[in-house]
Structure formats: C-alpha cells, structure tokens
UniProtKB/Swiss-Prot annotation:
Glycans are attached at N2, N46, N67. This is Truncated non-functional hemagglutinin-esterase homolog. Its main location: virion. It comes from the Viruses. The truncated hemagglutinin-esterase of Berne virus is probably non-functional, since part of its active site is missing.
Length: 142
C-alpha cells in the first residue's frame, strides 16, 4: 500500500490594499495536493498587519506544523488522511477521505471498484471452501 502524503498549500491572500490571485488554487488539485482556503475576509487583528497574515491564515499555518492535512475530533494520527472511519468533519483542514465519502459537491469520488473486487474475491473464496467441505462430507457419508 502506498501512503504518499499529499502536498499542502495555503491560499496566498493579501489584505484589501494588495492584489491577490488564485494561481495556487488552480495548480493544487487532489489527491496529490490539498488546498486550504480562507473562509473569511482578511482582517488585521491581534497585532498582525497587512503583510503577515491574519488570525485565520495563522491558524492554517499552525496546522501545518503538525505535518498533517487534517486533525479530527479524535486527534491527529499519521494515518488520519486515509481513515475510512472518519465520521465527523475535521476540526482543522480538509480530510480527503471525509470529502470523498460525504461531500457530494466535489469532483472526487470514492474508488469502490477495487474494494468491491477485494470483497468479491473473499466471498468467492469462502463459497469455494464451503463447497469443498460439502463435497468431502458427502463423499465420506457414502
């Protein structure tokens, strides 16, 4: 299994007085890149200024210090990116598995074909084993 951790990118937005573009958002596409975008307008508070990020940007950057793309309510684990048990929205970031399973608006979809083949293979194996036991018991009883 390949557990390649995607690149993480944060929206490079300036204050109202400076021009911003969305080049990073256009370049960063899942599953190889996870893009964190601001949800509120740029605000200068708590001693920050127009050039060094507002509170929301600082919070997003703080999350990167954990080397994690998402932190769930259960805490951070290195495999949080790939957890299929992600039932709650992340407290920070955007967990790809959560987005794929529960967000119908995205272009990403869950790869159910490979997992279906895996389940079908095991079911077939169990059926074959049961049939072998039935045949053996039939032969022994005769």
């Amino acid at each position: 299994m390949n557990f390649t951790v995607p690149v993480q990118a944060i929206q490079s937005i300036w204050s109202v007085g400076k021009e911003s573009d969305d080049a990073i958002a256009e370049a960063c596409k899942p599953p190889f890149c996870i893009y964190f975008s601001k949800k509120t307008p740029y605000t200068v508070t708590n001693g920050s200024n127009a050039d060094h990020g507002d509170d929301e940007v600082r919070q997003m950057m703080r999350g990167l210090l954990y080397n994690s793309s998402c932190i769930s309510a259960q805490g951070h684990t290195p495999l949080a990116l790939y957890s299929t048990a992600m039932l709650y929205p992340p407290m920070y970031g955007s967990c790809p598995q959560y987005v794929k399973l529960f967000d119908g608006s995205g272009s990403e979809s869950v790869d159910v074909i490979s997992s279906s083949y895996f389940v079908a293979t095991w079911v077939l194996l169990v059926v074959v084993i049961i049939l072998v036991f039935i045949i053996i018991s039939f032969c022994i009883s005769n």
